From Swiss-Prot:
Species, as recorded: Methylocella silvestris (strain DSM 15510 / CIP 108128 / LMG 27833 / NCIMB 13906 / BL2)
Name of the protein in its database record: Large ribosomal subunit protein bL32
InterPro entries from the UniProt entry: Ribosomal_bL32, Ribosomal_bL32_bact, Ribosomal_zn-bd
Compositional bias ranges of the Basic residues kind: 1-16
Compositional bias ranges of the Basic and acidic residues kind: 28-44
């Protein structure tokens, strides 16, 4: 059975756990619509990405 030869120090344990942190998603304000969207993602309300129409927006008539 494999057993560690030395106790893992708190510093080494912290270095290992530093990759486990969860980051909150970042949002940017869209220049055209003013809506919040993820960077490098298509604006789902307008269908625009980098100034080009990529998707046709769905019109919600309720």
């Amino acid at each position: 059975m494999a057993v560690p030869k030395r106790k893992t120090s708190p510093m080494k344990r912290g270095f290992r756990r530093s990759a486990d942190a969860l980051a909150a998603p970042t949002y940017v304000e869209d220049k055209d619509s003013g809506e919040l969207r993820r960077p490098h993602h298509v604006d789902l309300k307008t269908g625009m990405y980098r100034g080009r129409q990529i998707l046709t927006p769905k019109n919600k008539e309720a």
